[in-house]
Amino acid sequence: TFGAEVLEFQLTENPLSEDIVAIRELWAEHKLLLFRNQSFNEAGLVGFSRHFGDLEIHVREEYLSQEHPEILYVSNIERNGRRIGILSDNEVGWHYDQIYLPKPAVGSLLMADTLPPEGGNTEFADMCAAWDALPEKTKIRLDGALANQSYEAFNQAYSVPTNNKQKARSPDIHHPIARTHPVTGPVSYTHLRAHETTP
């Protein structure tokens, strides 16, 4: 089953080791986990996230938390005449977080802070199921194929273009269209339109 809601569980900065093991197993099985009614501050979010691997500092430093640069703000809120977060009011195309890096993110932990009264939904897709649904001849054709991942193309379509320093940190890169999950084994289809320029 794609996606699971974990009930009656409070995330903490220093969880028990058995809780981390259980969360990892659930995450591997369901690919997406939802924890409602949490009371994290930014330090807690970073501390909890570190239990799942090294944290990437996003290339868009102007939208990072000053106290905890591991956190990227996604927001349309303005302070002192400027937006505090990336993407603003744009409807973002389907994408794989940080697929434009040599080593793409294994996952993302999103925490909702200030929500609009309606809309603002975040949608997720099971890309293993998407791969499984492809005709066998298409899978054969795509096996081993690469797609050009361009963070600059993403920004031109959905956000504010990067500066020269940011461009240097995120050059275009080729990644396989089909990737095998390192833990559970199923193949995932990573060809999502937001970052690709050419297959």
Name these PLM-found stretches:
Residues 196-199:
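Single conserved hydrophobic/aromatic residue that forms the stacking wall/gate
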Residues 1-193:
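Non-heme Fe(II) oxygenase catalytic core, chiefly the N-lobe of the double-stranded beta-helix
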